[in-house]
Curated annotation (Swiss-Prot):
Leader peptide range in chain numbering: none
Entry's family note: Belongs to the DNA mismatch repair MutL/HexB family.
Stretches for region Disordered: 335-411
Protein name listed in UniProt: DNA mismatch repair protein MutL
Functional note: This protein is involved in the repair of mismatches in DNA. It is required for dam-dependent methyl-directed DNA mismatch repair. May act as a 'molecular matchmaker', a protein that promotes the formation of a stable complex between two or more DNA-binding proteins in an ATP-dependent manner without itself being part of a final effector complex.
Keyword line: DNA damage, DNA repair
Biased composition (Polar residues): 343-353
Keyword DNA repair carried by entry: yes
InterPro entries reported in the protein's UniProt record: DNA_mismatch_repair_CS, DNA_mismatch_repair_MutL, DNA_mismatch_S5_2-like, HATPase_C_sf, MutL/Mlh/PMS, MutL/Mlh/Pms-like, MutL_C, MutL_C_regsub
Gene Ontology terms describing biological process: mismatch repair
Organism per entry: Shewanella pealeana (strain ATCC 700345 / ANG-SQ1)
One protein family per Pfam: HATPase_c_3
Length: 628
């Protein structure tokens, strides 16, 4: 049999078999074209499940008159010009087959106008002849595409369409997927003249949670964990079903790569593996969005672009796994560590995180301006809204060290009255709590101390503990105590050798010529610090670091360390000071710092007590009374 070239109409119908599977496929291709055109609103109208009519209207950039006919031909696109463009593609469409394929199996009308044109133009194309007629029309800036009588010229394909209800369900499901990815777009859907979906732009987090509730259900929106993680060129964001709310298999499973919805077994495996430590056999719900360098992912794998191929699939898998595990671990810790916010809280606040702590008599210093504060409210707020956040390390609230002023400013009148009340207040006994304590691994040594934690004194101005002894009132700097406790913890662990924590994603940096010699000469010191380094293919691989460096920028910190130890072998005191500086944000509440202080030896406690500053409260009260 002789080889013959297929006629254009037959070739387009064959291509349509891959691209146009059902009405939902048509809507997918047309809406993606609208988004590529920069539309901020997309209106979808269908009749009889899309078999009778599909109309997509947008406010995008439009198509010039001279390009209308070309837009309906095969392999015509404005998305790319060369192979390099394909390797770095970020748009939804790029093959130039959608409009040609749709017009070959339907009666298609394309109306469009650009901002530069004074009038719109309309292109008509029918599947039989593939001839395009261009006529003037009335239309605002943007485009409208109508596909009438889908599969009218391919009866076999039309017979395979399901009921109107089933086809509408497929369309509705696809719209949910794209609405989750493009929160900035206003989507509407009409079926048989009735508006059934109206997704308004979700420009704030609260609005997006509302959209999440519309699409994924109220239960998912109320219990999901916020994911926000960035490492090098990878960024993962979205929402994950809470382990406490997950059960069985969830249909809410959406994964996007650079804004494109894909089906990938890699992410499903990472999610199930992350959940395996809480419950076996759970396939939880998630809405996850991965952003990465387009050169690191191939989207030209499937005709319908449902699949992608990662150049470093194992690296992406481990990255997603670590981000999800960190988010779930943090949510578990927050549920234990953080009490509901009271109406009046101070900057340093007690919480049952490290042991039973007596209630404090808080002093409202809302009018004062402390130089630095440590706010548990901020921690709770950011954790509940942002979940996991970090650049390769675990979530960490920020402790802003208080500045050490040589003089204490005069307190407010409210504080003076509170000082007097403190003197007449009976001591409060330590109360037990039913909340199970689960200290982090790096605090295990601190928790095993034999020293008991006394009741924590009140906190004032977000910076100081108020110490009352007989008729004396003193202020003890919390930041100073936290620093001393941290140094004591490091010193105790350094004496035995700090146990390094392996990085799930090792950090690689270009190696300097003298680094191999430094690592070899200082191997004992690095092992004592819990740091494991290796050199391979001209790269320095950071495999393990002590817990005090987990939140540091290792790519910059480790070279500085190597340069430091190259010149001299530092003393233990210098190493302790350096580690303490890197882990300045160690304690995340006043109660943690107080518990660490209580675990210090008596002589160290006395020395720190001696650094407290006595307040001349009697003089202030006399002056206050004389003023009256």
């Amino acid at each position: 049999m002789a080889i013959e070239k297929l006629p254009p109409q037959l070739a387009n119908q064959i291509a349509a078999g891959e691209v146009v599977e059902r009405p939902a496929s048509v809507i997918k291709e047309l809406v993606e074209n609208s988004l590529d055109a920069g539309a901020t609103r997309v209106d979808i109208e269908i009749e009889k499940g899309g078999a009778k009519l599909i109309r997509i209207r947008d406010n995008g950039s439009g198509i010039p008159k001279e390009d209308l006919s070309l837009a309906l031909s095969r392999h015509a696109t404005s998305k790319l010009k060369s192979l390099d463009d394909l390797e770095a593609i970020l748009s939804f469409g790029f093959r130039g087959e959608a409009l040609a394929s749709i017009s070959s199996v339907s009666r298609l009308i394309l109306t469009s106008r650009t901002a530069e044109q004074t009038e719109a133009w309309q292109a008509h194309a029918e599947g039989t002849e593939m001839a395009v007629k261009v006529l003037p029309a009335a239309h605002p800036v943007g485009s409208t595409v109508e596909a009438v009588d889908l599969f009218f010229n391919t009866p076999a394909r039309r017979r395979f369409l399901k009921s109107d209800k089933t086809e509408f369900t497929h369309i509705d499901e696809w719209l949910k997927r794209i609405a989750l990815a493009r929160r900035d777009i206003h989507f509407t859907l009409k079926h048989n003249g009735k508006t059934v979906r109206n997704y308004r732009p979700a420009n704030t987090e609260i609005q997006y949670i509302q959209r999440l509730g519309q699409i994924c259900g109220k239960a998912f929106a109320e219990t999901c964990l916020r994911i926000e993680c960035e490492h090098n060129d990878l960024k993962l964001s979205g929402y994950l079903q809470s382990p406490s709310a997950a059960s069985g298999y969830s249909e809410t499973q959406y994964f996007y790569v650079n804004g494109r919805l894909v089906k990938d077994r890699l992410v499903n495996h990472a999610v199930r593996q992350a959940f395996s430590q809480y419950a076996e056999g759970i396939s939880p719900g998630y809405v996850l969005m991965l952003e990465l360098d387009p050169h690191q992912v191939d989207v030209n794998v499937h005709p319908a672009k449902h699949e992608v191929r990662f150049h470093q699939s194992r690296y992406v898998h481990d990255y997603i796994l670590q981000a999800l595990q960190s988010a779930m671990a943090q949510s578990t810790q927050l549920s234990v560590d953080i009490e509901p916010e009271s109406e009046q809280t101070t900057a340093w606040q007690t919480s049952p995180t490290r042991g039973a702590v007596a209630p404090s008599h808080y002093v409202d210093e809302s009018k004062s301006k402390p130089s630095a504060v440590f706010d548990v409210r901020e921690r709770h707020s950011s954790a509940s809204q942002a979940g996991y956040s970090g650049g390769g390390g675990s979530y960490r609230s920020q402790l802003k060290p208080a500045s050490r002023n040589s003089e204490v400013s005069l307190p407010s009148q409210t504080s003076i009255r509170a000082y007097g009340e403190l003197l007449s207040t009976d001591s409060v006994q330590t109360q037990s709590t039913n909340v199970p304590l689960r200290p982090a691994a790096h605090q295990a040594g601190m928790m095993s101390t034999s020293h008991g934690a006394a009741s924590m004194p009140p906190v004032i101005a977000g910076q100081y503990w108020v110490l009352v002894k007989e008729d004396k009132i003193s202020l003890l700097d919390i930041a100073m105590v936290a620093k001393a406790a941290l140094k004591a913890e490091i010193a105790a662990k350094l004496a035995q050798g700090i146990i390094g924590q392996p990085l799930l994603m090792p950090v690689a940096i270009s190696v300097d010529d003298d680094w191999p010699e430094i690592i070899d000469n200082r191997e004992q010191l690095l092992r004592k610090l819990g740091i494991e380094l290796s050199i391979r293919l001209g790269q320095l691989i950071i495999k393990k670091v002590p817990p005090y460096l987990r939140d540091s920028q290792l790519a910059a910190l480790i070279p500085e360390l190597l340069e430091w130890i190259r010149l001299e072998l530092p003393s233990d005191a210098a190493v302790i000071k350096w580690l303490a500086e890197q882990a300045a944000n160690r304690f995340t509440s006043a109660s943690e710092a107080w518990f660490a202080f209580s675990a210090l030896p008596d002589d160290v406690q006395c020395e720190l007590y001696n650094h407290s500053q006595e307040l001349p409260w009697e003089q202030w009260m006399k002056e206050n009374q004389s003023d009256r």
